[in-house]
């Protein structure tokens, strides 16, 4: 069941799946792309806008050690006929 426009949902993104498949020095950049792809798939959104705080959390321990999972709050809105997902850190 897709998220209705205007709703907020908390997701736990499993970044560990990506960490195993890429070299150590590519982990944080690949984790950022994975978060974007994962949210787009689960929120059924064409565009995903990630808050800078989420990016800072991914890069907090450097490029080789992103977190294993990340709790995020996703708000979906409808703009010009497209679904847009806004991603923030969950409290």
UniProtKB/Swiss-Prot annotation:
GO terms for molecular function: structural constituent of ribosome. It comes from the Archaea. GO terms for biological process: cytoplasmic translation. Transmembrane segments: none annotated. PROSITE patterns: RIBOSOMAL_L31E (PS01144). Keywords: Ribonucleoprotein, Ribosomal protein. GO terms for cellular component: cytosolic large ribosomal subunit. Belongs to the eukaryotic ribosomal protein eL31 family. This is Large ribosomal subunit protein eL31. The lineage of its organism: Archaea, Methanobacteriati, Methanobacteriota, Thermococci, Thermococcales.
